[in-house]
Amino acid sequence: MEPGTRAKRAKMIETPKLTTDVIIRVWEKNRFQGIVLIDRKNPPLGLAIPGGFVEVGESVETAALREMKEEVGLEVQLVGLLGIYSDPKRDPRFHTASVVFVGDATGEPQAASDAQEASIYLLEEIPLDRLVFDHREIMLDFLGSPD
């Protein structure tokens, strides 16, 4: 094999786009207020867990923190990994793989970037039927997890 052939082939291979999402638990004076969901301003429209794409040269953790600041204006502390979601049909636009974290924050979310609105939902009031992508499955995993 010629030098550099493997690297050239790797550049030609189409791979899933890497994304990250964070289920943000909002706290006020050590009291749980709920989790943040955004109302998307771009298709597919509906409610979503805040998240976005990992940039080249960026770790998924760094991307998660950056996206939370950009999308909902919150400084988030990541507390754990919920899971990795990679069903090729999870995003109707293209194949993505998402690393989903749980994080804690204080304050009020402010819609920005891809968010038309950002709101705090009590766990029992999450409208699961309005969640886009595979976020219903992700939310059910979160709700069924201890903690």
Predicted features by range, described:
Residues 2-8, 82-84:
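Short Pro/Gly-enriched beta-strand edge/turn motifs at strand-loop
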Residues 6-35, 102:
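Conserved N-terminal beta-strand and adjoining loop/helix that marks the start
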Residues 14-16, 45, 93-97:
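Residue-level preference for beta-strand/loop junctions
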Residues 26-29, 41, 104-109, 123-125:
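Short loop segments at secondary-structure junctions
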Residues 30-74:
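Conserved Nudix-box catalytic region and its N-terminal flanking loop in Nudix hydrolases
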Residues 74-83:
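A short coil-to-beta-strand element that immediately follows conserved catalytic motifs
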Residues 86-109, 142, 146:
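Active-site-adjacent beta-strand/loop module that shapes the phosphate/pyrophosphate-binding cleft
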Residues 100-102, 110-144:
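NUDIX/MutT-family hydrolases
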